[in-house]
């Protein structure tokens, strides 16, 4: 079972909220959310495979989205959590939406920051560049370059620095495994866009998230169960750039009927 942390609800609520980080991060990126949300919900933080305090998989193990989602479900089962709200950032947003399609009975509401629904030409070029250089360059150079392209502005300095710092804790082999997983991402994203689910989804996107915000706007215009809040002066990692706004908007959504 993946490494995970539980913070019981201070109001004795039976409701759960599960936070899923992105590639290269770990559950420490939710430090601004834990104290706030444990007032209202039981909080579950998960470290994905090879991230944070979760174990590295044996040599030769290849990842698929279904394997990673099963990891998350195993944590829920271990703690007898039948249903939970889910909150994800970046790659975590893809995992949660993929899980919703296959296991909608485990999901209440969804809040997504830095949500990835498609890849624009710049992000596709980045993916190709990473693929061509991952066997030549230290992965942290590639990751750092990605971080500066995705989060380029001064307002993103804190989130950019945290992600680079946490990514340094991942092994090179683990980075390559997750990178190979992203090669399968386009058909997964197409299915997410094409198949609207009834579960309420709130996208909380930074106004500077230029690579991914346009696609979210398009989907919200088409999917009736989805809504969007754009947070000013914030980039891809909106929960770190503007934590108070992120928390208050997400809480209002989760508590609404």
List the predicted regions and their residue ranges.
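Flexible "cap/lid" loop of the alpha/beta hydrolase fold
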Residues: 97, 101-102, 107-137
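Short beta-strand/loop motif that positions the catalytic acidic residue
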Residues: 197, 203-205
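Alpha/beta-hydrolase fold catalytic core
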Residues: 1-18, 39-41, 77, 81-82, ...
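Conserved alpha/beta-hydrolase catalytic His-Asp/Glu region
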Residues: 121-123, 140-195
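Active-site loop/oxyanion-hole signature of alpha/beta-hydrolase fold enzymes
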Residues: 35, 44-87, 91, 248
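Catalytic histidine-centered segment of alpha/beta-hydrolase-like enzymes
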Residues: 234-247
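Conserved HGGG/HGGXW glycine-rich cap/lid loop of the alpha/beta-hydrolase fold
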Residues: 5-56
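Conserved alpha/beta-hydrolase "acid-adjacent" motif
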Residues: 210-216
């Amino acid at each position: 079972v993946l490494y995970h942390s539980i913070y019981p609800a201070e109001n004795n609520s039976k409701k759960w909220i599960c936070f899923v980080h992105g590639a290269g991060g770990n559950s420490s990126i939710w430090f601004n959310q834990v104290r706030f949300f444990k007032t209202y919900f039981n909080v579950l933080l998960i470290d994905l495979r090879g991230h944070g305090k979760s174990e590295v998989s044996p040599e030769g193990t290849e990842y698929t989205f279904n394997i990673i989602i099963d990891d998350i479900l195993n944590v829920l089962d271990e703690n007898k959590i039948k249903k939970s709200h889910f909150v994800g950032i970046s790659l975590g947003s893809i995992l949660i939406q993929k899980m919703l399609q296959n296991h909608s009975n485990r999901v209440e509401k969804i809040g997504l920051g830095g949500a990835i629904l498609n890849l624009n030409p710049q992000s596709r070029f980045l993916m190709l560049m990473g693929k061509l250089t991952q066997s030549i360059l230290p992965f942290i150079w590639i990751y750092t370059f990605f971080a500066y392209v995705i989060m380029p502005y001064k307002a993103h300095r804190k989130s950019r620095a945290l992600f680079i710092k946490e990514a340094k804790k991942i092994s090179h082999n683990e980075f390559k495994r997750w990178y190979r997983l992203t090669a399968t991402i386009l058909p997964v994203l197409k299915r997410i866009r094409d198949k609207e689910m009834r579960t309420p989804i709130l996208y909380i996107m930074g106004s500077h998230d230029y690579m991914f915000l346009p696609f979210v706007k398009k989907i919200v215009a088409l999917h009736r169960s989805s809504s969007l809040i754009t947070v000013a002066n914030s980039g891809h990692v909106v929960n770190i750039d503007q934590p108070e706004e992120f928390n208050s908007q997400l809480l209002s959504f989760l508590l609404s009927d």
